[in-house]
Amino acid sequence: MDLIQQLTVEHQDYALKLATLAEVIDGIDANGRGNYFIATLDELLVPFTTELADHAHREEEFLFPRLLERAPDSPVAVMLAEHQVILEQSAQFGQWYNVWRDGDDDAYRKWADPALDLRGTFSTHMQKENLILFPLARRVLTDQEIRKLSDVGN
């Protein structure tokens, strides 16, 4: 599986996790704190913090520079700006979720709102990458370049 395929698969996994995140927040809004919700959020914390940062890093370090070389007018600058917003939302979720989890009910909106914002921002961002950026990469990069990116990006 090459780097672009791997990133696309990760996007599909994130889309499912984002839906789960929104469902859990809806559940907490309706029912309050509960062990099921906390267990589910605990499972989502690493994917939406550490793993998400790693995903963005692989795009920024391996794919985006090659795209800028070959297609300087590509939407890479937009993608980079969106990465900043997404990673900030991710950080807010990670920081305040743990405070709330440890018992501070006032921290709920401080993590839930950024998490819901993350869902919207990241969902549209992934669509741009899947529908515009990745097909562009396949057009302007050779198969050999994509294989090389895959070797260093994994």
Roles of regions detected by a PLM:
Residues 1-154:
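Small-residue-biased structural context
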